[in-house]
């Protein structure tokens, strides 16, 4: 039996790695896109093109080969072009039946911080904030998120008390004709 493959787009946190590897038996691949965001250029014009191309390069996996993707709040740090590029890559590499977990802030932020999320257990996620050179650049409304992940279905969506929308998307399995 093959272990499910999950990609973590955030900075790998030990407890999350242990949770997916030891508790769930998943192969976890950490693709820390926050490092790319931190080292991105300061020139807004070329930033969009650069980030979009980084998204394509970093997620150069075989189409339909990944069981799950942990996005955390990475989309809050991306402009529209880079976010669309990343979402398209995620949809491309996701297996039918595969899932995407993402967090979207429901309010605008101006302070510069990065949030690292750690899975504590099956019921709890812990967050820790750190200073960073980059602030969240975009607030995603529900309609924008639906468009971003066009082709995936929404499995679950919760608005948390801390004004974060937690969403689980699923790639539909192909229907078989009878």
Residues covered by each model-derived region:
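Class I (Rossmann-like) S-adenosyl-L-methionine-dependent methyltransferase catalytic domain
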Residues: 1, 6, 13-58, 99-178
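A short glycine-rich, Lys/Arg-flanked "PGG" loop and its adjoining helix->strand segment in the class I
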Residues: 84-99
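Hydrophobic beta-strand segment of the Class I
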Residues: 69-70
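Residues at alpha-helix caps and immediate loop-helix transition turns in enzyme cores, especially N-
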Residues: 16, 82-83
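Hydrophobic adenine-recognition pocket in adenosine-nucleotide-binding enzymes
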Residues: 74
């Amino acid at each position: 039996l093959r272990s499910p493959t999950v990609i973590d787009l955030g900075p790998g946190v030990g407890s999350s790695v242990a949770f997916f590897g030891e508790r769930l038996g998943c192969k976890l691949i950490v693709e820390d896109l926050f490092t790319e965001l931190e080292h991105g250029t300061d020139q807004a014009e070329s930033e969009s093109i650069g980030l979009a191309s980084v998204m394509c390069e970093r997620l150069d996996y075989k189409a339909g080969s990944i069981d799950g993707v942990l996005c955390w709040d990475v989309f809050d740090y991306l402009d529209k072009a880079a976010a669309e590029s990343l979402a398209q890559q995620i949809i491309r590499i996701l297996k039918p039946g595969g899932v995407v977990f993402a967090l979207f802030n429901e309010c605008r932020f101006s302070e510069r911080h990065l949030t690292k999320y750690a899975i504590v257990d099956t019921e709890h996620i812990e967050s820790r904030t750190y200073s960073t050179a980059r602030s969240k650049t975009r607030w995603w409304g529900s309609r924008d998120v639906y468009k971003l992940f066009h082709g995936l279905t929404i499995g679950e969506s919760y608005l948390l008390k801390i004004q974060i929308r937690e969403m689980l998307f699923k790639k539909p399995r192909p229907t078989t004709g009878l």
